[in-house]
Amino acid sequence: MKKQTLFSILAAAVVIICGFATSCSTESEGAKANKEVLNDTFVFYANLGEINKKGGFDELLTESNRRLLATIIASSSEGADYEEYAMKLLADPSESGINYDTPIYGYLNVKDDSVSLVIVADVENAKNVDKFITFLEEMSGESVGAVRKGDVRQFSIDDLHIAYNNSRLVAVADESLDYGDSPNKVIAKALNRPDADLSAYEKYDIAYSVNIKKLVDILIADKQRRLDYSYEYLAVCDEWEREWEMEYINSLEKEIEMLKNSTKDFEENARATIGITSKAGRIVAEMSVDGYNSEYKLDKKVSNEFLEYVNNNALLVANLAVDGNMVSEILDKYFTAEYAKELGLNRNEFNLYVGIASDAFKSINGDMTLAINDIKNKPYYGIEQINALMAVNVTDDYIISNVSMYGAGILDSYGANCYGFNYDDTLIMLGQKQDTLYLTVNNDFRTRSNSAASKAWVKDVKNSHGYIVVDVDNVLKNDFIVSTFREEFEKDDYYYDDYYYEESKEDKIFNELAYKAIDKISYIYLSITSPTSVELVVVMDDKQTNALKQYVDLVKPYMLTILASEAL
């Protein structure tokens, strides 16, 4: 184990446990004045107090459980008896000196070739932090050698540099600080920086945010360094290496050019944000981009008119509102012969396929719906048999007429504008009825008396531009999927090369938890809510209880069992 690694592990464990043992408070409007909006390359945000409140983590720490956990935490202490201090710490996390009522956040400090991660937390009582550090030193048997300058205490643990004063604690992690700013400079900047305006993240429990142009600049700089090195190497390498090296150089130059062009529609401070929030009956992950300006507008929304053709027991349904003319215009503008050259493709073949796709999309205007109704395995073969459907709104018969022309001799005719073929007991049909183009696999295109249009998830996605829904309730009724899941995760004890392998207790617990966790889910959907935002939502069977609380309650009995075994 590297020097002071045990200290790092203990510190992280105790800080997290304390964070989940506290309550949260809301910042007043007046306190938000004179704060700095974080426009760093990367920003991380976590509201541990809110997470605890929603998940009920503090319910795990009853008096007896705190005593048990305190015994475990203090068991490695070789000096004074710290069990009572650990008890106080778990009962009142403010004893650590860190303010858990305010969110913690982090950002990237970028300087030349160096990128360092900075984590910031508010300090409530610096003297209590001193005592907390001493406690961790005693438990780990390692001294961190903290140095004090004025009201700043600072120490290093391997490549982790930590400092705190009377109001703020910062942790800086990076192995490459010697090539950019020194740890002292990064720490000084972090300690003296204005308070952060975190209002953009307050609606989330956890959030990650990236400045798109700054991130791309980092990627370009990295590739440019490799390019510079390759040119230097090209000047001295052997003749037989030159061809390969030139190919690599050309590839890097193309990648750099593509990266430079990738941000032309983004404003200078455009940011991409992923925020996760636990709510009653659901977990929501929202992905959004601010500062993106495109000449193409995503105005069309799904009508869901094809759901009446989809079985109520469908495993997966995907739907996208397509403006075919806009897609065709994008294909013609960006997928050019020059683009084919950049990708190293045959330009004539590329132009042919892009032209076919462009013409086909001109015929599409409206919903493009895909449904997988069932998956079965064939006995003895283990081959999946799929029952699926795809339906598309079209404005003319361009696509079906080309199918009949190019599919002659391959496809069988099943009537007017209906073609198909049978392969290994799989019947694939392609046809058109009025303004609907359809493709079925082991299915027939007709309305259902008990269709997916009546499913609960329909109301969640009805105003979207597109979505994908996995109906977990139906998935868990599918014998093939369930048996495949169990075969993958529930390995029995077995012999291999005369060795006996026994599934560990931890593996058994994990497998049991995994299945129970999935069983709590009703459905999962990914929805395009606006031209620049997407939501991934996990919807639980229990719609009243906070989703995080449901999972904490699920894990609770297992955690207590593990704690008891660790204490023995």
Predicted features and spans:
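Structural boundary/hinge residues at secondary-structure and domain interfaces
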Residues: S25-Q154, S199-Y380, V552-L568
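Hydrophobic lipid-interacting interfaces of membrane-associated proteins
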Residues: G49, D174-D178, K213-D217, D290-S294, ...
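Single conserved position on a long alpha-helix in the C-terminal lobe of the eukaryotic protein kinase
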Residues: F44, S94-Y204, F361-H465
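C-terminal motif of bacterial Sec signal peptides marking the signal peptidase cleavage site
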Residues: G19-S23
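Bacterial N-terminal signal peptides that target proteins for export
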Residues: K2-L10
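Hydrophobic helical h-region of N-terminal Sec-dependent signal peptides
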Residues: A11-I16
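Broad, structure-driven detector of short, well-ordered beta-strand segments within folded domains
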Residues: I104-G106, L160-N166, N261-K279, M368-L370, ...
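Long, C-terminal catalytic modules of enzymes
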Residues: A452-L568
